[in-house]
Amino acid sequence: EGKTYPMAGVINAVAYRTEKLGRFGYITLDLNEEQAEARNIWQQGFPVRAHEFHYFDSTDPGSACLAKKPAGKRSWSCSYAKDGSLMGFPHLYYYSNPMFAFRFLENCMAKKLEREKVS
């Protein structure tokens, strides 16, 4: 409790353990309007289903996506989009948006080809 550990340094935030589950359950994720960084893997208006279940939170959970509970009006910003990656707590259900999965794989292939050109 209260300890922090250095990680990869990709996200400038601190994750910490909480006493209870936070943002638990099924959600729908959609891209926030201003997230041009993620448009190569995702298009706004085509949400992905996901779920969260964790005893951790972050000093900055990100703002690339808007997470919404399926029932009710509860929503929050989450996740980061950077260099073709989407990073955050939600676990994505790819079958809910096959185009998202397809674009993710396209991005992986493009990154591989980019690395091969350099070496």
What are these regions (language model features)?
Residues 3, 48, 95, 99:
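Conserved active-site and cofactor/substrate-binding residues in soluble primary-metabolism enzymes
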Residues 16-19, 43, 90, 94:
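Hydrophobic alpha-helical scaffolding
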Residues 34-82:
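Catalytic beta-strand/loop cores that center a nucleophilic Ser/Cys/Thr
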Residues 6-9, 74-75, 102:
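Feature representing long, continuous alpha-helical segments
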